[in-house]
């Protein structure tokens, strides 16, 4: 149970949950998906889940928004696009850089008129950025990007990694760690003096929810962001197709 009592973690066997929630969990074989539309291939997998909606007694059902964790299916995926080799960066003390033919934090700062803030010395000092991700993150990757690609000065030890529910495992491009790197690198470049807390969780529905509950309970981050998931348009279409629970 989290301090706010809004997220309650329950433990038990599959049979106990089947009995308590009136469901029947089964094993499902997910076929492999070949590469298509610029997205990499997905390997075949075996997952567990249930086709039935969980049931709760009428005395407590109105207070429960959703029951998560009856499946370990991981539908979220990251599809990063790699920058071609040979790009160059300029050596500058400002939180910016220049690539050839690619958008950068400097472009974001210009388009959203952040440069006046930098000139006034507002660079995130004393603030904390929170990033939620579902793939392993290595702080050394972001530090290399800031120091050797953007050539900006950042504070030592500015990144804290919080493994929610045991974490997602070791960093892996296949699992989407490139997306984790991107989130931290870009936000940290725009606010070079801010601290960063990375909440990394297993790639499951309950892992995603627990990461946000953990961040809210700790109340350390001044802002919290995540690039995992789908847009509202896609989510609503999934709900209409009974592929997604509207409560989730």
Whereabouts are the PLM-identified features?
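Substrate-binding/charge-relay-adjacent region of secreted/lumenal peptidase catalytic domains
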Residues: 1-4, 9-248
């Amino acid at each position: 149970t989290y301090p706010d009592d809004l997220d309650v973690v329950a433990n038990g066997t599959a049979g106990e949950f089947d009995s308590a929630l009136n469901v029947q969990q089964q094993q499902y074989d997910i076929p492999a998906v070949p590469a298509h539309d610029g997205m990499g291939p997905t390997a075949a997998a075996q997952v567990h889940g249930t086709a039935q909606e969980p049931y709760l007694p009428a005395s407590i059902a109105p207070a429960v928004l959703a029951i998560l964790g009856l499946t370990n299916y991981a539908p979220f995926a990251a599809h990063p696009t790699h920058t071609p080799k040979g790009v160059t960066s300029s050596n500058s003390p400002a939180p910016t850089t220049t690539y050839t033919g690619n958008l950068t934090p400097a472009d974001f700062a210009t388009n959203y008129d952040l440069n006046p803030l930098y000139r006034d010395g507002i660079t995130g000092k004393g603030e904390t950025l929170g990033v939620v991700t579902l793939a392993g993150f290595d702080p050394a990757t972001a530090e290399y990007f800031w120091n050797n690609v953007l050539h900006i000065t950042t504070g030592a030890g500015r990144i804290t990694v919080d493994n929610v529910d045991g974490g997602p495992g070791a960093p892996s491009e296949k699992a989407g760690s490139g997306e984790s790197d991107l989130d931290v690198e870009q936000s940290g470049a725009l606010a070079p003096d801010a601290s960063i807390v990375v909440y990394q969780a297993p790639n499951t529905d309950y892992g995603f929810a627990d990461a946000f509950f953990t961040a809210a309970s700790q109340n350390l981050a001044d802002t919290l962001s995540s690039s995992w998931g789908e847009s509202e348009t896609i989510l609503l279409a999934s709900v209409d197709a009974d592929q997604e629970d509207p409560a989730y």
